[in-house]
């Protein structure tokens, strides 16, 4: 947890002794979610591929008395997802909550400017980790006859200049609906939290911003930064609340879906986007 806990969660203890895996827990929404679930009593498994980031999150959690461990893993492969679930189960004996947070736009540009390799990399980063983690955790949750899976979606499915990323997030929406129907009989709930524009001050995953019409080889850092600001302003103007969200606000929605307060909610998408249209 950061220097301060989220005061909005004061007194909430909805996840006491629940074993919660948070993928991509080393930064942004993932780190905020690990903090929130830990603050509510969860035992947290921080999964990330960057050791320094995961270590920082775990240290913050432990500083506030939260039981936490890290697993360094590449979730772009099924073997990596299986290893994560095995380590979590070995450490705690069960898995109650899985938050699939690993993803992130790499390139922002019109679709015709993407190379085939770039498309594959976008899908590998933003779809496959969620798909593999769901597949790997299912046998464990089916055996328990319980579990809550919360996927992190996006408002990009109705936006511009991120078609491969949006395709990944659209796939996650389909995965959520179908899994909820198939595995509800096992007591497993599956939902998605779809954030809008969110300020991520601790982002370590790079993005390549290219003004539409500018080829990738012509990348100009100053122009890219100007384009980033223009895009942020454009997204903000689409939001009813006229501001970008905070990771802690996204984490609050995830904590609700993960908890028994949402015990009769499955197959749903909660848009935590400030009214983004």
Residue ranges and their predicted role:
Residues 2-12, 108, 254-255, 266-277:
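Short C-terminal tail/terminal secondary-structure segment
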Residues 19, 26-27:
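Conserved glycine-rich cofactor-binding loop
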Residues 86, 125-143, 180-181, 185, ...:
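Amphipathic alpha-helical dimer-interface segment in Rossmann-like NAD(P)H-dependent oxidoreductases
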Residues 134, 168-171, 176:
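Active-site helix of classical SDR
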Residues 14, 92, 131, 146, ...:
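C-terminal substrate-recognition "lid" of short-chain dehydrogenase/reductases
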Residues 184, 189, 265-267:
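Short, small/polar-rich loop/turn modules that mediate ligand/substrate recognition or access, typified
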Residues 112-131, 146, 150, 172, ...:
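Catalytic Tyr-X3-Lys loop
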Residues 82, 105-120, 143, 161-164, ...:
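Conserved mid-core segment of classical short-chain dehydrogenase/reductases
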